């Protein structure tokens, strides 16, 4: 059976991956031409994209390191 720590680790990795994908998408949308329809839709949309852009900037490197370390750990546990 799977213990609670493994389940919690899997959930945390999944949440981190989803947050990284959303933040990465926000960075891509934010880097588009300011005259595009994406950034001109509404102030609320632009503010949300900006917040996710900052989250993406702050978690990109630590998130990548954590995901890689967890992957290596899972490979070592199989042996």
Swiss-Prot record:
Residues 2-8, 69-79 are intravirion. This is Protein OPG081. Belongs to the orthopoxvirus OPG081 family. Induction: Expressed in the intermediate phase of the viral replicative cycle. One of its GO terms (cellular component) is viral envelope. InterPro entries: Poxvirus_I5 (IPR006803). It comes from the Viruses. The gene is OPG081. Keywords: Late protein, Membrane, Transmembrane, Transmembrane helix, Viral envelope protein, Virion. Envelope protein. It is found in: Virion membrane. The keyword Transmembrane applies. Disulfide bonds: none annotated. The lineage of its organism: Viruses, Varidnaviria, Bamfordvirae, Nucleocytoviricota, Pokkesviricetes. It is a multi-pass membrane protein.
């Amino acid at each position: 059976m799977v213990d609670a720590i493994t389940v919690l680790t899997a959930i945390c990795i999944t949440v981190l991956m989803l947050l990284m994908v959303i933040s990465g998408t926000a960075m891509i949308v934010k880097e588009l031409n300011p005259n595009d329809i994406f950034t001109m839709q509404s102030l609320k949309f632009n503010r949300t994209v900006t917040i996710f852009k900052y989250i993406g900037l702050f978690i990109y490197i630590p998130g990548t390191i954590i995901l890689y370390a967890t992957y290596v750990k899972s490979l070592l546990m199989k042996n």
